């Protein structure tokens, strides 16, 4: 059985993945006051800010690195398997945050998250090109991009 307008359901699922992607990304900044008290109770305010900055920088550089990696992965394995891989790895990385014991483990988990979450954008762009004719791509792009604003 073929679903009518399947491409619109695909782009909606990508938008939902984008919402989750951005919630994961922003959650550290929201939870940092509690995390820092738990992991670094003896550090000064300045040292805590520096730790946060270092962890955030690791995430950003990992995300940038992941863009190129996942661009190639999506071209190699296709969009379906590429999304399974990206979302699977970022889900595991998110869960691993609960086991962080310090700056090194938290940085590693954030870096893995950054690399994996980076797959969302190349995958979304490739899906858009595969599923939508040229005259509908801008709308589809707008729908999945709205996930970033919501998340």
Model-derived features with residue positions:
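Hydrophobic transmembrane alpha-helices of Major Facilitator Superfamily
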Residues: 23, 27, 99, 103, ...
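Residue-level signature of mid-helix packing/kink "hotspots" within the transmembrane helices
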Residues: 26, 59-68, 118
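Conserved MFS/SLC helix-loop-helix module at the cytosolic interface between two early adjacent transmembrane helices
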Residues: 65-104
């Amino acid at each position: 059985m073929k679903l009518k307008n399947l491409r619109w359901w695909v782009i909606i699922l990508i938008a939902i993945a984008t919402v989750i992607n951005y919630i994961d990304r922003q959650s550290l900044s929201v939870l940092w006051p509690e995390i820092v008290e738990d992991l670094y109770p003896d550090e000064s305010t300045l040292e805590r800010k520096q730790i946060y900055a270092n962890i955030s920088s690791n995430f950003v550089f990992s995300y940038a690195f992941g863009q190129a990696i996942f661009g190639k992965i999506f071209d190699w394995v296709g969009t379906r398997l590429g999304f399974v891989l990206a979302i699977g790895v970022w889900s595991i990385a998110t869960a691993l945050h609960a086991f962080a014991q310090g700056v090194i483990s938290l940085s590693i988990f954030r870096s893995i998250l950054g690399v994996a979450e980076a797959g969302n954008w190349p995958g979304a762009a490739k899906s858009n090109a595969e599923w939508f004719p040229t005259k509908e791509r801008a709308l589809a792009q707008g729908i999945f991009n709205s996930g970033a604003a919501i998340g």
